[in-house]
């Protein structure tokens, strides 16, 4: 069986500067992978390139999703195919409620106009499972949200949109230990209902991985994946930093 995500020799440039210099990465359906690396290694660039951000230009290599070459696909087509990106810093949208946003997103994902009643029913079910206040749906999207609330909102989106691959770009940034546990448990709660969901977590830190329990950990350094291992690789990085790869 072909992997869900296969990246081969991917080169990506931003504003004419090459950031990714030949990334190879494979993620199977239902697997959790972590991508670690120092600042400037290209982690967020890879996340943006996977989602088809137009500012991130693929200059060589391929991205295959479920056996199809999606290297040139626009962002909306990738999203409809089942790729989900959780941003490091989600945008606040004044005047648009969480419910309104999710109705539009769910309708686009499923290719059908979903009623407000159907959205509210699905939201209430998942908010109860995720330990969220039902009134959360009436708040304006990410407006005045704490860091933990923004991440809960993204987990709610992930649950309702039912992607096949979720890319979490530094979702642990700025979160305390309790909020990290909420994120980790929330992801596992979603995967209980959708065990085929694959997750690629982009992170600097090993802490969130203690709850997520990744199958594979990849080290991105200077635009390339230079080492792949299990959770022990994350512990090595946490203990000693990146010095052994700088030499």
Which residues are covered by each model-predicted region?
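The feature captures the beta-strand-to-loop junction immediately N-terminal to the Walker
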Residues: 36-38
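ABC ATPase C-loop
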Residues: 158-159
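Conserved beta-strand-loop-alpha-helix hinge in the C-terminal portion
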Residues: 216, 220, 224-247
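Walker B catalytic motif
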Residues: 170-171, 178
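ABC ATPase NBD coupling module
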Residues: 57-59, 69-84, 237
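Conserved structural motif at the start of ABC-family nucleotide-binding domains
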Residues: 5-7, 20-22
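Q-loop/switch helix immediately C-terminal to the Walker
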Residues: 85, 89, 95-110, 122
């Amino acid at each position: 069986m072909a992997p869900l995500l296969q990246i081969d020799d991917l080169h990506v440039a931003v504003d004419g500067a090459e950031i990714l210099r030949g990334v190879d990465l494979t993620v199977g359906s239902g697997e959790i992978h972590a991508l670690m690396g120092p600042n400037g290694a290209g982690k967020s660039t890879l996340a943006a390139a996977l989602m088809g951000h137009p500012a991130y230009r693929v200059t060589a290599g391929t991205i295959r999703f479920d056996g199809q070459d999606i290297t040139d696909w626009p962002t909306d087509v990738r999203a409809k195919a089942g790729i989900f990106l959780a941003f490091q810093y989600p945008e606040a949208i004044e005047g648009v409620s969480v419910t309104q946003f999710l109705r539009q997103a769910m309708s686009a994902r499923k290719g059908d106009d979903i009623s407000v009643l159907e959205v509210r029913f699905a939201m209430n079910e998942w908010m109860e499972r995720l330990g969220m206040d039902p009134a959360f749906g009436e708040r304006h999207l990410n407006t005045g949200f704490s860091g933990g609330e923004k991440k809960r909102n993204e987990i709610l989106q992930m649950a309702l949109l039912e992607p096949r691959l979720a890319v979490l770009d530094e979702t642990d940034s700025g979160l305390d230990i309790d909020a990290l546990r909420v994120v980790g448990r929330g992801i596992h709660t979603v995967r209980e209902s959708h065990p085929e969901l694959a997750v690629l977590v982009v992170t600097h830190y090993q802490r969130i991985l203690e709850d997520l329990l990744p199958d594979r950990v990849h080290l991105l350094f200077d635009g390339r994946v230079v080492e792949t291992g299990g959770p022990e690789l994350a512990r090595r990085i946490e203990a000693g930093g990146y010095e052994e790869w700088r030499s």
